[in-house]
Amino acid sequence: MALNRDTTWRYVLVVVAVALSLAAWFCTVLGVYSTVTVNFESYLTASVWVLLLLAAVLLYTSQYGLVPNCILLYPIFGASVNLLLGSLTVRSLVPLFFDTVGTSIVAIIAGPVLGMATGLTTTVLGGVYFAYDLAFAPVGIFIGAAVGLMARRGVFNRLSSIIFPASVWASAPA
């Protein structure tokens, strides 16, 4: 697709959002982050959370006008599915990772950018209660982008191409 004035700003917003997410991640990698309190009394935790929130807003903004407005709500529903399934698996001590199911579903339906927004929204909302989750923002972004790009290439068109990878993924030790 050729870049024109209408699409260039969308790409710029996505790149800036990913850069902000990586900057927030680098802040969590610092040795200082492990010693600070993981509530919002720490400036470092609060600034990481604000950077990730701003990145999520930029991802949503990049899709405004490109998709119907109701589709912009999909990442919020996907994030709620992620948080619900993640808390259920943690409480039931099931050794499976179900906290990215919503991200994968939204990425398949709405594309990689909204899949990335779902992963980032999950991190931002989960970071309110567990600030350690903020360090895993790149994981949600990567999963949303990878699954969305695979869906665009038609990887999920056949049932057999879904069942085998899902069974391998679900049987992975936690």
Annotated model-derived regions:
Residues 1-174:
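Loop-helix junctions at membrane interfaces
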